[in-house]
Swiss-Prot record:
The keyword Magnesium does not apply. GO terms for molecular function: GTP binding; translation elongation factor activity. The keyword GTP-binding applies. Its main location: cytoplasm. Belongs to the GTP-binding elongation factor family. EF-Tu/EF-1A subfamily. This protein promotes the GTP-dependent binding of aminoacyl-tRNA to the A-site of ribosomes during protein biosynthesis. Keywords: Cytoplasm, Elongation factor, GTP-binding, Nucleotide-binding, Protein biosynthesis. This is Elongation factor 1-alpha.
Length: 15
């Protein structure tokens, strides 16, 4: 589930 958290941070940072 750590991967999802990392992706979430990347997505939020990309927005």
């Amino acid at each position: 589930a750590k991967e999802k958290i990392h992706i979430n941070i990347v997505v939020i940072g990309h927005v």
